[in-house]
């Protein structure tokens, strides 16, 4: 298991994701946050839905995940928000930067 992760969540409201990003960055729980426009297709309440959404990706340390998750859930506009993470590895200096910028 890696020490570093990318956490992601989606929303139809960019301002919600920008607010979550700001809170997490100010609390130093993530080192970087990126918001992308996406098109999503998913099942919801028995219906197949096509939706324009935004994807928020954040880089952090795995030991900070529970704090990140709590802030996302406390500030999200969805009834059942996607909150997932993937282990990452990569360029040593970049990973060191994640360490330096998170608390």
Annotate each predicted stretch with a short phrase:
Residues 1-103:
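Positively charged, small/polar-rich N-terminal and surface patches that mediate targeting and assembly
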């Amino acid at each position: 298991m890696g020490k570093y992760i990318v956490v992601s969540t989606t929303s139809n409201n960019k301002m919600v994701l920008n607010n979550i990003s700001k809170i997490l960055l100010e609390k130093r729980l993530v080192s970087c946050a990126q918001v992308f426009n996406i098109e999503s297709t998913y099942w919801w309440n028995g219906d197949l839905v096509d939706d324009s959404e935004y994807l928020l990706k954040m880089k952090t340390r795995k030991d900070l995940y529970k704090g990140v998750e709590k802030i996302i859930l406390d500030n999200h506009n969805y009834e059942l928000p996607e909150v997932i993470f993937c282990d990452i590895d990569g360029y040593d200096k970049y990973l060191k930067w994640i360490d330096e910028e998170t608390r």
